């Protein structure tokens, strides 16, 4: 049940290996890339408690020594203080360009460690071992790394491709239902942006995926990674098509900023709401029928996911303030917001031609339901 997706970017091609049991194969999978038998691992406390011993054992069985830095869990770790701590740890460990740093965790750890690897000695290699569904299908693939700023999400970072990605789908069984569904928001995004047949498959298999059907999970992760790899190969540094991967994210990042990048709203939950709002905005602009956002919401709700501003606990800014937060998004070009909208499920496109009053109306109507 092991699948491999090859990501072919100039000078930095690598494999994403997907399936159950890969953690115990960590030693032989990583050993061919090492110039000396040692690695440095950066992880977070929850993953460390569950899986760090197994990874270190797998490495030791292949004669590979390892040292680990364990950071706090949560989005707050994706910040300057923990970047500094990570960089200092790598330097203290005398990491060289021929060494491998392992990012062992979810999207926060992958983004943080990838950025640290990009900066230490002007770039050392790193391996992603993503432990969350969100990281397996999205953040571990494609080379985007970085941290958040108080001004906005992911505003500080670099493109730095991994050397290898090991996506052990068995690890998904240790996620809380909320964390798993947060990642599922990114899976659905792929169907919505470019593969109507995949979205239809998710409508049929979503319950099985959530229930732990391993074959269904491997299929969903593999198709998601294939779609991301195809887009990254065409546009590694987000000059064009790669922006399609941000479907739902213009709304999402504003909502994350409004909720303090914390547990009130997980990233994948924001993506889920953002995708629903992007399809609602598309329908109001006459780009697709109202049946499309209704179908999107129906599937997300059936999976127990957030779809509306009313699903976010606590206070939110008004529509104008949310629009201002959207203006801090890194996709702004010449002061204009770029939206990813859709002509239908599986047919997304990029545009800056979106009247602010229509965006405000979507936000106001969503807030009115709270």
Question: Predicted regions span which residues?
Answer:
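ATP/NTP phosphate-donor binding region
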Residues: 1-100
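C-terminal charged capping/lid subdomain of soluble metabolic enzymes
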Residues: 3, 185-187, 287-370
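Solvent-exposed alpha-helices and their adjacent loops that cap or buttress functional pockets
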Residues: 8, 33-34, 94-96, 119-121, ...
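Generic secondary-structure signature for well-ordered alpha-helical cores
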Residues: 60, 92-95, 161-164, 170-177, ...
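Short glycine/serine/threonine-rich phosphate/pyrophosphate-binding segments
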Residues: 108-115, 136-137, 253-254
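A glycine/threonine-rich phosphate-anchoring loop and its flanking beta-alpha core
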Residues: 115-208
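Active-site segments that bind and position negatively charged phosphate/pyrophosphate groups
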Residues: 204-320
